[in-house]
């Protein structure tokens, strides 16, 4: 329990910390937009490309996500402008002019002080979950070669993210964009399930007897949960943005931050959902497609993905969507049916087992993305040294580093690290299969029940190893 240490407890409860980090990140985000739209068309000399898709992406996938779960959401700048407008305040909690309380437990906003343009509507039930985030991610991923190599396109995509967040903040309650729409938030939430950090209540019984529910409704110390989470029922990381509001507002001192065994949330059976399982399949499929497009030797595939011709891109899009939405899920559906027989779970619907076993793919998927990110960062991070002095590519030399030459870093170590990551992900996924099967009453645990999934996971890992150690070498 990290809140045991007074110094860390004080830091985590500081409202200014969150505001400062978000404001600094917002400055970088706006600079990336301006550089992308107005700066040089050379991606390796443009701040918008280098610092978003290399530096930020490397930090997210290599450090923040595997170690901190939704830690990026704590400082993400995208919701900041909309939230400030929604609250009519930059830092102050409701007792000093905020607008987030009083609220109702059902989530609707009852405040009379809300700025009239911020309607505070509830998000439609039919659109809840992460299906929209799955679709948004697929859209960004499909055009990723264009977005990551053309600064102006990247800049306008970032503008769309910001405009979407502000627009939804003016119409819907709290961080609706983050919870249900953000294309990045979907996979961050999914992979946060394996993170070794969690925010939880200490004793749910205390919450049962506490009628005011300050953690959700807000009080003079802070806002109600921006993520629409009810901490007293929360037992998984997927929808908690680690904003820390409940740490400030809980009058019973019953909310804390813990270190825990990685992957604990994967076994929370009532949290198993088809949209999240599909996200696991989508992320694994894209983790195979990205190294083929960005790192592989297939020039024709790069040309297709880069929109060199409409017919080529059409063929690429068809294959991309088929792999993500049909082929990979279909293979795992077949494996789930075999597992149902092998584990003696014939009374369990195949659909239920298919969804549950989808979560066992999360460790391997995260490892695959870390492996891809490693190649991307090691090969390109040195561009950041020159770009920081000349963010627009206009010949500036702000810090005297403009002329530092590009050179790849640690590339001789990359294959070994990638292999270790993928093998560790494979082992973790197989162990998770066994743990998930044990949650079903009557399952014949052991080698027989695990074999179908283990065979599929091993084949997928071998293919990924070939991509990194063979085809891309």
Predicted regions and their residues:
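Membrane-embedded alpha-helical bundles of multi-pass integral membrane proteins
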Residues: 1-209, 223, 229, 244-248, ...
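Solvent-exposed, extramembrane regions of membrane proteins
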Residues: 214-235
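Conserved short loop/turn motifs at secondary-structure junctions
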Residues: 69, 234-237
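Aromatic- and glycine-enriched pocket-lining scaffold segments that form the walls
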Residues: 238-244
């Amino acid at each position: 329990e990290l809140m045991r240490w007074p110094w860390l407890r004080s830091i985590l409860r500081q409202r200014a910390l969150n505001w400062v980090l978000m404001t600094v990140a917002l400055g970088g985000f706006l600079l990336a937009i301006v550089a992308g739209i107005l700066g040089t068309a050379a991606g390796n000399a443009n701040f918008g490309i280098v610092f978003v898709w290399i530096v930020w992406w490397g930090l997210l996938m290599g450090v923040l996500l595997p170690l901190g779960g939704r830690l990026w959401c704590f400082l993400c700048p995208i919701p900041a402008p909309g939230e400030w407008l929604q609250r009519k305040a930059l830092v102050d909690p409701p007792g000093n002019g905020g607008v987030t309380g009083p609220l109702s437990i059902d989530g609707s906003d009852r405040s009379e002080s809300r700025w009239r343009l911020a309607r505070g509507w509830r998000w439609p039930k039919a659109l809840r979950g992460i299906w929209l985030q799955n679709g948004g991610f697929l859209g960004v991923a499909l055009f990723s070669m264009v977005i990551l190599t053309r600064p102006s396109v990247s800049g306008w995509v970032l503008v769309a993210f910001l405009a979407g967040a502000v627009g939804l903040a003016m119409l819907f309650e709290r961080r609706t964009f983050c919870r249900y729409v953000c294309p990045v938030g979907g996979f961050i939430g999914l992979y946060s399930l394996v993170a070794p950090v969690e925010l939880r209540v200490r004793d749910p019984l205390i919450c049962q007897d506490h009628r005011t529910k300050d953690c959700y409704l807000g009080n003079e110390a802070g806002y109600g949960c921006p993520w629409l989470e009810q901490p007293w029922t929360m037992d998984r990381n997927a929808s908690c943005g680690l904003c820390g509001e409940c740490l400030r507002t809980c009058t019973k001192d019953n909310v804390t931050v813990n270190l825990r065994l990685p992957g604990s949330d994967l076994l929370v059976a009532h949290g198993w959902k088809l949209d999240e399982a599909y996200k696991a399949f989508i992320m694994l499929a894209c983790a195979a497609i990205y190294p083929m497009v960005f790192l592989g030797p297939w020039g024709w595939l790069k040309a297709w993905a880069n929109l060199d011709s409409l017919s080529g891109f059409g063929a690429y899009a068809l294959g991309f969507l088929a792999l993500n939405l049909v082929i990979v899920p279909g293979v795992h559906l077949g494996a789930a049916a075999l597992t149902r027989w092998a584990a003696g779970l014939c009374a369990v619907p195949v659909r239920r087992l298919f969804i549950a076993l989808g979560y066992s793919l999360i460790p391997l998927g995260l490892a695959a993305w870390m492996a891809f990110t490693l190649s991307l960062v090691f090969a390109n991070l040195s561009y950041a040294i020159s770009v920081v002095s000349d963010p627009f590519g206009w010949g500036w030399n702000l810090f005297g580093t403009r002329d530092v030459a590009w050179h790849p870093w640690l590339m001789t170590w990359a294959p070994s690290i990638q292999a270790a990551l993928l093998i560790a992900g494979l082992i973790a996924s197989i162990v998770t299969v066994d743990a998930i099967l044990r949650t079903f009453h009557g399952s014949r645990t052991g080698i027989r029940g695990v074999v179908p999934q283990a065979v599929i996971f091993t084949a997928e890992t071998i293919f990924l190893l070939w991509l990194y150690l063979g085809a891309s070498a």
